[in-house]
């Protein structure tokens, strides 16, 4: 190092943004700060973690600065603990001298997380620090360490003992640390530290605990700590640092420690001693165990050739067989040359294990579906020759990069495959990958507004001014430039200005750590030798401390184990069919099923993989897919950008426009997509056919076109035109084709991925078209807790003529089941009952037979699992109807029933079963004397338990009255709107109302309603909402006036008016005929039910009773009655009432 003694200084304690919500300097900025300050080195010092070690090393090296890799390790078992209530475990500063030291530091950081899962924070016992001390320099910890507080408290003996122990373990690699941030406790501790150091000939070292880069960042950093701790900036008792905790220049540090210049000199000495940096590595894979003495390349070739023989057996070939063998030899040659046989074998192995154990595996994902070797190894299930898929899109010999298979597994059994991989390669060699959430524009604005205690309404308005576009996030600075109201608020309100200024400084800093949804790494050695490890409390697996980018730089190879819900749906549907005696292999379905394509053309694709959004369903109606290739094209086209070409595709398909294949030689490439360039593979093939590119070169061209770098594009155009000229294509024509292809290449889709997902789309569509009952049961089981989605499926099932039966404790399963061509509603889908509790219920029933009555039920279940709330909601949902009709009585008696259940359970636990001898009724409590709910109340209670109307609808008895007011139901409105009708009177019960602000600030609303034929949504613009808001309350029955707009099979409703349903029918009904069954109660009892409904205006009521011989007798009651839903419900549930009829 060139710095002269007495002048230089090196910061050894820099907290990066990886000290989450504490450090405010990004890892790539530390080296730049040091270089600007003319410091030869800088030390990373994040608390407990090494998240940024490799990243910092790389960027510091680029800045010409020596990275020092350190970590502030929280320790227990030495010195004193925290003295302030918000303080955490004390830390010791450890710095890596060499590779051995770095590996030990990695081990200690890993221990902090992996061994502290049950503790409030990561900590390391001092004994572990001592065990892993080789190659590490120890600083005594400063203000946050285990010694300073003891000296400050006058506990000199304890402090001295702790320092002596550190010195014993680390010897000449131990430094006593001094800090001067102006804190009283530092001044109180310093004499003891200096005296001990001089007495024991241990060097002093000066450090500044750096949290932020410049003095002006202090206020923003203070807010950051408040975000971390859930505190407020204006709060007195809270954690804070001082304005001195910044990256001070060397001269300031020298001035601060002018009385102890050696303490600054020793920062340079330590920097010299720490001549190690974390290096990037080439990819490292575990060795794959092979058979018969073969190496990995030979094993791959052996498995691939045997696999192709098996694939070709019984296959309808899409090309001559020699083409398959030729392609196999080509791919194997590239895989061997690039050194990836082991990768293919590892992936194939865990997929084969999954399939052998009955775990559903997807047919492929991403560009890997273009590999024939992947197909013959059963990594994928798509014949790439059949679908025209390219290997070079996956693995390009012209551009060396790791292959990357993304594998979809059944989401319920994915963990089993991961466990297999752990057992095969070693639990210490398999880990997930960490990810970091950051403070993005809206979130940081909301957080800063909260800690600065701005009014919640104001903060909410500010946040809504920031555009929300997850696909292309807008920064806060961009939002202020783009949104005049935000700029105006900043100008007019000092508090808003201060909030925005702080938020702008904090935006982009890391907020939290989590784990990658699917990525795993597998090492050839214990992973702590390659990366430190982290433990997410929500996962059983450890995770790497380096994120996706840097874990690959560390040499680890990522394997993606994704959980795909649709695979679980498919598996469950197949199992339902197997119970009926139908064995089906979805992987062998023919691609020419007429019912499937009829379903797709109808757009009735709720629940069909990739094809269920409203926009996609509209496009299906236009496109009328007739092949798997067209489904593949649709999946590729239905995205921003390519979507503009859907109309051209459809018009060319149906002959409304001519197909333009650009050049005769390209007809085979573009014929499948009617002249529209849809796929990246088409771009590659055009370059190959027209301009003589190899497919490897064509993949590089595709990438260049996607990046749109002008210099590179200019060179590629010269190459393209030149190559085309050699094939006798005029320069003008080839140049225009190049420009057209370049335009499409920017948003061309990966055909391999689209084809693989089209395969799953076809399978789900086939099931829905051919076995809809099993499809709905399986689909609904995978959305047990999503009542909105269950309501959609229920409505869709009705369209398919499928009955969804109410839950029943004696018939239903915990999941949705199939019985006699109907779907049985799942007990586990009832709100607030608990899936595990319902599995217990089903197990009890399976062991002891059906429940005889509600007492038998509570006497057999475990009340610790099926609690009072579960009993109440089972009753509300009608699950006890088969053994106890009175739902209201069970709800009213829930306390009694659960107490009886607890008593019986205690008896069983005490070995006193059968206490009441042969009389099962003995000792049973009395149920509350409660009448059952009327029909309206019953449906409302059912709604509360199920989330939607399942067995009936509050308005179904009013349909006749409503029709007299020319009110139509949803099903009729849809049909009439598609036929051209535009204005309707409709009705419904309001499910929810979501209000939003327009650009002008006025409120409009999306109102969800349900009528007896289904659920629908109406958009109420501001002027309509203003006059109808009070009527459109959730739970209210309303009659509405709407305008309808129909396009491509989709109907949208726009609200003009709304009124209570009672008002809509008050002058409509002439009367009501009440048909009585032979078992009818006394007429007087029915009259009493009518008394509350007597009114000046209303309809007449007539009782009708059969008297034999096909004759009836009528009794018209005097007076008039309000014939609303409440009265109808009361009559409908009265004993002996058979039918209500409007007249």
Swiss-Prot record:
Its annotated compartments are: Cytoplasm
Q: What is this protein called?
A: DNA polymerase III subunit alpha
* Protein EC: 2.7.7.7
Q: What GO biological process terms are annotated to this protein in UniProt?
A: DNA replication
The protein's superkingdom reads Bacteria
**Pfam families per UniProt:** DNA_pol3_alpha (PF07733), DNA_pol3_finger (PF17657), HHH_6 (PF14579), PHP (PF02811), tRNA_anti-codon (PF01336)
Recorded source organism is Caulobacter vibrioides (strain NA1000 / CB15N)
| Its biological purpose | DNA polymerase III is a complex, multichain enzyme responsible for most of the replicative synthesis in bacteria. This DNA polymerase also exhibits 3' to 5' exonuclease activity. The alpha chain is the DNA polymerase.
**Record Gene3D superfamilies:** 1.10.150.870, Bacterial DNA polymerase III alpha subunit, thumb domain, Metal-dependent hydrolases
